[in-house]
């Protein structure tokens, strides 16, 4: 009897053990959900690429290159300080230094541009009437009418040709600090009056009176370029030499400044 009761007790305990084990196993097998880490759910945002900052514009103005004359005035003036400019007429043989002797305006009638005695003289302006800056209303450059063709010897021959005022219309004067470009507007026979003595061209009325005296010339050989206008305030260059066949009169070529390059 005792043995039978013990067996039942063992059987009951066994069943309890099985039931408890099953319950324990079921509780331990429930899935565990891990919480996501913040880094695994946030999409990575690319860092913005900084835009290139443009270079600030320079506030410094561009400096212009200083004018450099094609004429070597340093060498010329070392040889003769009276040389202040250079006269050139493209397409012709006129290519001479310009000289001026302070206090002796007749000097270059009998001396060349080196200052040596010469019957051909030089191309010169007068210090009593003109500066060496070419800023006067009218500048007169003189040169002999040499039979050999030197100096202004071919001036009348050149500008008496048909279309000469167009073909040889440009006259250039070079100075150490700038160059001036002139356009020929007249070439005329003229009387022997001293232009700058008789016409004070700093006075606009006298300036216009001088121009009128040019346009009134009606002689054979007078030529005019009607396409070139000359007005008060303009700068006029006159090339003056003896008239061929009449040394008591003058032959003039007149040009007006249209551009300065500095």
How would you describe each model-predicted region?
Residues 17-262:
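Solvent-exposed, non-transmembrane regions of membrane-associated and secreted proteins
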Residues 1-13:
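N-terminal Sec-pathway targeting helices
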């Amino acid at each position: 009897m005792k043995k039978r009761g013990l067996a039942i007790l063992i059987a009951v305990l066994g069943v309890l053990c099985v039931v408890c084990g099953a319950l324990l196993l079921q509780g331990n097998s429930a899935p565990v959900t891990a919480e996501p880490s913040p880094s695994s759910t946030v999409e990575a945002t690319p860092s913005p690429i900084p835009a290139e900052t443009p270079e600030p514009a320079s506030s410094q103005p561009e400096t212009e290159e200083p004018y450099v004359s094609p004429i070597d005035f340093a060498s010329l003036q070392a040889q003769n300080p009276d040389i202040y400019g250079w006269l050139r007429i493209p397409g012709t043989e006129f290519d001479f230094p310009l000289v001026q002797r302070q206090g002796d305006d007749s000097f270059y009638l009998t001396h060349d541009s080196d200052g040596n005695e010469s019957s051909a003289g030089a191309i010169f302006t007068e210090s009593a009437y003109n500066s060496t800056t070419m800023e006067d209303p009218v500048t007169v450059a003189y040169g002999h009418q040499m039979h050999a063709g030197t100096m202004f010897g071919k001036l009348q021959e050149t500008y008496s040709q048909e279309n000469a005022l167009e073909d040889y219309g440009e006259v250039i004067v070079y100075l150490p600090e700038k160059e001036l470009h002139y356009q020929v507007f007249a070439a005329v026979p003229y009387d022997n009056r001293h232009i700058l003595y008789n016409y004070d061209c700093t006075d606009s009325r006298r300036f216009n009176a001088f121009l009128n005296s040019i346009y009134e010339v009606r002689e054979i050989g007078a030529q005019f370029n009607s396409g070139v206008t000359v007005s008060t305030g303009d700068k006029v260059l006159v090339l003056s030499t003896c008239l061929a066949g009449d040394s008591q009169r003058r032959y003039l070529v007149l040009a007006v400044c249209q551009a300065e390059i500095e």
